[in-house]
């Protein structure tokens, strides 16, 4: 039996304008702004929450972490303000209103769930190694394969039922802070001992720890409830 060291909590996206981001990502994911915290998009399931974190810097490089979503039609996302970047694959790559990449997978409308997230995809130097590292932390199996772009590894069940956590090979190194990251609940010392790097401790501005995984992907750690 695999031991679960951490539990998935939610996702966070850096944005320059909350209202613009919420108007796109709310309908795109089947979420709505929390009446008391409009920067948090919710649907009643805590793990589905997407926090929109305002940052001063705009997007400058391709997102190394992006979301894949289920759609009835790509035009639904275009109507929300997205633009098509590449439609040559069985999925369509788009940019959201702030330029952040996402991929849309068209489904039969009768099969669509209210919550539209399909996958969280992470560009990786070594997909097999980093996926295995996260699989050990989440206590779930890891699977390895290839797609049209090369090596790919993925976890099922780490971020909730029917959501895949995917690591895909890319040649370029990470050069900037990821604008999309995930939050987990767990023990910071255990994670550091396993190879994570501590970036920031709780201080006057934050009550959580910020860490980076062995490939430098930022994530936040909260105490277990």
Residue ranges and their predicted role:
Residues 1-37, 42-86, 95-149, 153-205, ...:
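Glyoxalase I/VOC metalloenzyme domain signal
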């Amino acid at each position: 039996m695999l031991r679960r060291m951490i539990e998935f909590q939610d996702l966070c996206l850096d944005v320059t304008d909350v209202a613009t981001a919420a108007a796109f990502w709310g309908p795109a994911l089947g979420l709505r702004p929390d009446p008391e915290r409009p920067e948090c998009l919710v649907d009643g399931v805590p793990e589905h929450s997407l926090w929109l974190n305002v940052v001063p810097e705009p997007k400058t490089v391709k997102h190394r972490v992006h979301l894949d979503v289920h759609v009835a039609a790509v035009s639904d996302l275009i109507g929300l303000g997205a633009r098509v970047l590449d439609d040559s694959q069985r999925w369509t790559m788009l940019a959201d209103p702030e330029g952040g990449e996402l991929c849309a997978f068209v489904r039969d409308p009768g099969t669509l769930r209210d919550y539209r997230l399909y996958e969280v995809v992470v560009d990786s130097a070594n997909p097999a190694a980093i996926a295995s590292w996260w699989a050990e932390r989440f206590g779930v199996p890891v699977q390895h394969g290839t797609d049209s772009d090369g090596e790919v590894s993925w976890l099922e069940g780490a971020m909730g039922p029917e959501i895949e956590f995917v690591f895909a090979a890319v040649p370029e190194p990470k050069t900037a802070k990821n604008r999309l990251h995930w939050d987990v609940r767990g023990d910071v010392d255990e994670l550091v001992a396993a190879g994570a790097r501590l970036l920031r401790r709780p201080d006057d501005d934050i009550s959580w720890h910020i860490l980076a995984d062995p490939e430098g992907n930022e994530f936040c750690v909260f105490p277990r409830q």
